[in-house]
């Protein structure tokens, strides 16, 4: 099955909730590293990719469309251009694998969806993308399930640790350090002085070498 992946990406000042531990230049580099992991998984699954960017950006392994409207409007514009099944996948889920994506696209349903933590949506696969409209932010998983019902779509909900792990907060970085072997995002964090640490209650978190943080 031929299908196309749509990856929203913010190349300028992304991931502001990581500002407590990464400056803007570092956050931009880290976001690019996570994007590389996602694109690698997409390509290995046999899919071509288009980046839906808020600012000018170039990538040798993906098409780029720059859209200045809000996220949902930009995604829905893109879905209207597709004449084949489509995958909407966020650029901040670096643990995703090609096998995970294949699991999504092999669904017998009209749509498969991976919920994110806190009610969000990390990935949607649509056999008929032009019939669907995206509604991200807030409890988007519930919104997307409602929209699928309105479209008359059958839906498979896929529960996956790797695909549901999006990176937004400092506490999320530990998942990359533990589970991200071979990923560009883990390499970036390690090269930036991050490592696994235990707090006084024995909970797992991350710490950063003060020397690296000062560079």
Curated annotation (Swiss-Prot):
TM stretches of this protein? none
UniProt protein name: 2-phospho-L-lactate guanylyltransferase
Q: What domain of life does the UniProt record list for this protein's source?
A: Archaea
Under which EC number(s) is this enzyme classified? 2.7.7.68
Gene3D superfamilies given in the database record? 6.10.140.50, Spore Coat Polysaccharide Biosynthesis Protein SpsA, Chain A (3.90.550.10)
Q: Catalysed reaction(s)?
A: (2S)-2-phospholactate + GTP + H(+) = (2S)-lactyl-2-diphospho-5'-guanosine + diphosphate
Keywords attached to this entry: GTP-binding, Nucleotide-binding, Nucleotidyltransferase, Transferase
Under PANTHER family, the record lists: 2-PHOSPHO-L-LACTATE GUANYLYLTRANSFERASE
GO BP terms: F420-0 metabolic process
Under the subunit heading, UniProt states: Homodimer.
Q: What does this protein do?
A: Guanylyltransferase that catalyzes the activation of (2S)-2-phospholactate (2-PL) as (2S)-lactyl-2-diphospho-5'-guanosine, via the condensation of 2-PL with GTP. It is involved in the biosynthesis of coenzyme F420, a hydride carrier cofactor.
Pathway(s) of this molecule: Cofactor biosynthesis; coenzyme F420 biosynthesis
A Pfam family reported for this protein in Swiss-Prot or TrEMBL: CofC
To which protein family does this belong? Answer: Belongs to the CofC family.
Which GO MF terms are attached to this record?
GTP binding; phospholactate guanylyltransferase activity
